[in-house]
Amino acid sequence: MDMQADEMYRQDPLGSCGNPRQVSHITGRLSSLLGELPATWIEGEVTQLSPRRIGVFLTLKDMNESKHLEFFLPFDAFKDEVEVGNRVKIHGKLEFWATSGQIKVKGFEIQSVGIGELIERIARLRVQLALEGLYEHKRPLPFIPKLIGLVTGQNSDAEKDVVTNVLLRWPAAKFCTIYASMQGASCVSETISAIQKLDANNDVDVIIVARGGGSFHDLIGFSDEQMIRAVFAIKTPLISAIGHEADRPILDEVADLRASTPTDAAKRVVPDIADEKRLIKSAMSFLKKSYEPVIDKIKCDTLSWSQAFSNPFETFIAPRRREIDLFYQQMLTVVWANFSKTETEIAAIKKHLLAISPQNTLVRGYAMIEDETGRIISSADKLSAGDTVTLRLHDGLVRAEITQ
């Protein structure tokens, strides 16, 4: 930036419609501002590596974000061999490249992040997530999944192992497969996206993330904090089948089930149809042995009742004829006893009635005198000469007239 332009910028730093800044002024100012910043160490994953005649251009990406930054380093800045996918630290300074209009980092030194350092970071993250309780919540797997979600590399051995072994065990199984990078710069973002898409599918009731092992650097994405928290947040149970026994990724811890290999995942996600058939056959045999005697007895009883109801008289009445006759005799005895007792009581009452009956007195020669109205005359004072009376004898009536 020349002295005149610099003075103009100081007097009117924002510019105006009447006095706009030239592109060269802005780029020069930007370059000047960046030049004032100190050099710093920057860490990331190498996603692009382009050696040129003057040096090496490369791009670093964060593990947890999709942000990236471009670097330029001279050849003598490299002490170790660096490849795409490696995690590195670069000591450099921000610069504005006016010709391309980009901000890049001019690197002075590049170092590979050692495995020991990465292991230590992962160990700290593993403990932190454990303290937060991310490993405690385990979702149950369905006994027979309706639809298995599979996240794996396209045309990978892991995909073949899972699909082949699942179909061998349960031929009716169905898959919904989403391919993702199983290592490298895109591993975390693509795997998270695939898991979330499958979780949003209501037909998918279990998810398998499968990869056939690999080096520590290959599997580092499966210990990424963003991926672990994404898996914890889904509602669908998930099986981790990364297949690395020595250095298990943190995904194994947060998953609802850890499988040692993709083949092991296939054995865990569906039952073996041959085993289930044997169990059903065994159960049917047990039921047959347990209930066959009961069924035979029911058949026998049913036949007996059927025969009995075909001739109910011979079955129910004839065998009880003697009981009926005996009951009849007992009833007659009771009836006659009651009749005799009643007859005796009636005779006694009759005798008593006869003893006090006026008719019995008449038999002995007495007569009752009744006036013309039928009233009994019990005193001579009630009669007068000329009255007509009726004499009631034991065997009839006699009319008489009172003369005196």
From Swiss-Prot:
InterPro entries: Exonuc_VII_L, Exonuc_VII_lsu_C, OB-fold_nuc-bd_dom. Its main location: cytoplasm. The keyword Hydrolase applies. Keywords: Cytoplasm, Exonuclease, Hydrolase, Nuclease. One of its GO terms (cellular component) is cytoplasm. It is found in: Cytoplasm. One of its GO terms (molecular function) is nucleic acid binding. Pfam families: Exonuc_VII_L (PF02601), tRNA_anti_2 (PF13742). It comes from the Bacteria. Its EC number is 3.1.11.6. It catalyses: Exonucleolytic cleavage in either 5'- to 3'- or 3'- to 5'-direction to yield nucleoside 5'-phosphates. GO terms for biological process: DNA catabolic process. Bidirectionally degrades single-stranded DNA into large acid-insoluble oligonucleotides, which are then degraded further into small acid-soluble oligonucleotides. Belongs to the XseA family. Heterooligomer composed of large and small subunits. NCBIfam families: xseA. This is Exodeoxyribonuclease 7 large subunit. It comes from Tropheryma whipplei (strain Twist). The gene is xseA.
